[in-house]
């Protein structure tokens, strides 16, 4: 078994792995409380092509020179981690401190889940709603990104859909040839995420920038209070 998020170390440079998934209807959560249900997922077709190549001799010599000089090595692999934070009920504005501390990620994505989604099989844990979120921003080493919080807008109130635009711009839309398949309707009703690409050229770390250290806090403002606690599901890519 291979972690798909860590396959960059196994494939040649400039090789892209594309996985196309067909979204199932929301009535099919692949979870059930029926002990007699013997469901399974069957892969009908899968293929992968790999080619080998020999780098130019000048590149090999350059690597040897850099190693002899003791230059810092940049290893081309990606590490992904997932963290959970609890949001208490009855708040209109809150800060999730220390989402990430120490070595900072070049990308992060945040989704919201309820207690029922985490603990009950009758609730689909793969449906991410806005949970009445109004605005958001992150504070990276004391600096707000963006300077003013992002107003996510809405579909019915004539909003500018700034949240959806921010999401698309921060998931690699300028480096990938395919789109996410998430429409504005999907974004607000079942696939709501807060996404951040911290690289200066919005390449999701494809150019192997030197990583920063520090702290990232998440600031949230809600339209109204909630009676029940919810959770943030934060994943980062290093």
What role is predicted for each listed range?
Residues 1-238:
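Flexible assembly/topogenesis modules
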């Amino acid at each position: 078994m291979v972690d798909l998020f860590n396959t960059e170390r196994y494939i040649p440079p400039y090789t892209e792995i594309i996985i196309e998934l067909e979204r199932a209807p929301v009535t099919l959560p692949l979870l059930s409380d029926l002990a007699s249900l013997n469901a399974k997922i069957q892969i009908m077709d899968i293929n992968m092509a790999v080619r080998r190549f020999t780098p130019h001799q000048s590149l090999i010599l350059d690597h040897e020179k850099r190693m002899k000089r003791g230059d810092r090595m940049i290893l081309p692999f990606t590490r992904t981690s997932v963290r959970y934070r609890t949001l208490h009920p009855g708040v209109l504005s809150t800060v999730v401190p220390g989402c990430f501390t120490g070595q900072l990620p070049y990308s992060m994505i945040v989704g919201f889940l309820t207690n029922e989604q985490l603990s009950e099989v009758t609730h689909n844990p793969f449906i991410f709603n806005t949970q009445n979120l109004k605005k958001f921003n992150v504070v990276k080493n004391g600096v707000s990104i963006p300077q003013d919080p992002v107003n996510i807008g809405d579909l019915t109130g004539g909003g500018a859909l700034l949240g959806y635009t921010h999401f698309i711009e921060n998931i690699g839309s300028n480096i990938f040839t395919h789109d996410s398949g998430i429409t504005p309707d999907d974004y607000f009703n079942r696939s709501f995420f807060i996404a951040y690409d911290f690289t200066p050229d919005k390449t999701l770390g494809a150019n192997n920038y030197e990583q920063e250290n520090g702290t990232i806090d998440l600031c949230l403002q809600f339209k109204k209070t909630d009676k029940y606690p919810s959770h943030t599901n934060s994943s980062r890519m290093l």
